[in-house]
């Protein structure tokens, strides 16, 4: 079999000999061209993220880098763990590559013997008393293909330009390791502004009730984002600073609850970290935050009808009437929250 070649595998050969090849088989990729990565930290949640192409900008701010883009090493965007690239291999990808190699080798061997049989049969004399025929059943099995799905949140690091995908929110760029919390928040603002634009378009069709509901959803999203980003930051910092047995108690559902929907209760939690991210706000901005958080409660839990508590506390509206939701106020609210998110990122 000196003329035999593993034709399907040789195209992935990067070293070794013909009989003992070193292969580099590409990882399965998603429709957008990203590959699965899996955080090696067993305590990380949700662990799975996707890594795309590198697009290093012309002007690279090296002061923001943890690691030179494109070099050895990966950072988990969720928990911040740093490890070699191979440590982030997705087990399903390894199995998919093994399955492909087995299929390719089997097909190459089968193709060789099918050709050998054809050559042998053609070489046999015709018309004799005895005829010999070699019969090899061809292998028509399909090439195994692994399906990889893109996650909902796909963006690029604002520092090194690396594209990646996560579940809704992350803290770091997996390539350069730079802080990326504000990059995700910018995407949240984009989505909120799109809702505001949609509400204005609907209003032009004289469907004021639907327009009002869409604005209400946009307003609620700002508060939801405000709460969620604080939770993610807080859990990361607690795990970073405190021992595991202590941190697990400090970040469980009962210990956090909905405290990040209330500025005073959130401040009490931040005292455990000796931090006050709200210090970047003016008194007027703090009042704006409190107003909008109270308004969100009315929008989300009372069909936007002001109750006595809201009317008395905020000195706005009459009980039983709908609260006012304005596009410019939502935008101002989002920009105020952004100041807090930027401060959280600096404190990481």
Describe the residue ranges of each PLM region.
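Charged alpha-helical initiation segments
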Residues: 140-217
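A broadly conserved sequence feature marking short terminus-proximal activation segments
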Residues: 1-54, 92-150
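Flexible secondary-structure boundary motifs
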Residues: 135-137, 238-319
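Flanking scaffold residues of small Cys/His-coordinated metal-binding clusters
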Residues: 31-39, 70-74, 149-152, 167-171
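Amphipathic, Lys/Arg-enriched alpha-helical patches that create a basic surface
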Residues: 293-298, 312-348
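Cysteine-rich micro-motifs
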Residues: 65-82, 169-180
